[in-house]
Amino acid sequence: MPENKIRSTTILCVRKNGKVAIGGDGQVSMGNTVMKNTAKKIRRLYDGKILSGFAGSAADAFTLFELFEKKVQEFGGSLSRSAVELAREWRTDRMLRRLEALLIVADKEESFLISGTGDVISPDEGVIAIGSGGNYALAAARALYDHTNLSPKEIVESSMKIAADICIYTNNHITLEEIL
């Protein structure tokens, strides 16, 4: 029987020298079939002041984007408060608990990974990644972050290309956003 698990995405966020960039690939796969090459998994929220990206089920992620955007409005753009409140609601609501997605959110000051288990993680370094190719992108980005003078945007571009070369669920159709 073919595997119908939906696999997709590499999302990478890099913060360095007062700038932040987030990038995501465009591939969506179901089992061993590529269903779409140009999916947009990166969004700007709160008048472009917050960047976000998702890994996991697209329908679930869009539900979470909506909820997160409401939290951001409710808490006047406070990224940390919005992230904590979304994670709390996600973890405690019976319907939301079934959503299968991870979010990375970032503004000019902070970056967070938010999960349905209630995790709100801020990276020690300026790099965070999720998705099937996340570990490849993370490793590449950390090396470039520590050993080059590349900008966050350049680190994301290079690292995403490396992840796409390694991970079969990640492609080279990269969407990239940055806050300077």
Curated annotation (Swiss-Prot):
Where's the active site on this chain? T9
According to its UniProt record, the EC number is: 3.4.25.2
Q: Where does Na(+) bind?
A: A164, C167, T170
The known regulators of its activity are described as:
Allosterically activated by HslU binding.
* Catalytic reaction(s) noted: ATP-dependent cleavage of peptide bonds with broad specificity
Domain of life (superkingdom): Bacteria
Q: Which UniProt keywords apply?
A: Allosteric enzyme, Cytoplasm, Hydrolase, Metal-binding, Protease, Sodium, Threonine protease
One GO BP annotation is: proteolysis involved in protein catabolic process
- Which Gene3D superfamilies does this UniProt record tie to the protein? Glutamine Phosphoribosylpyrophosphate, subunit 1, domain 1 (3.60.20.10)
**Main subcellular location:** cytoplasm
Assigned protein family: Belongs to the peptidase T1B family. HslV subfamily.
Name of the protein this chain belongs to = ATP-dependent protease subunit HslV
Per UniProt, what is the name of the gene that codes for the protein in this document?
hslV
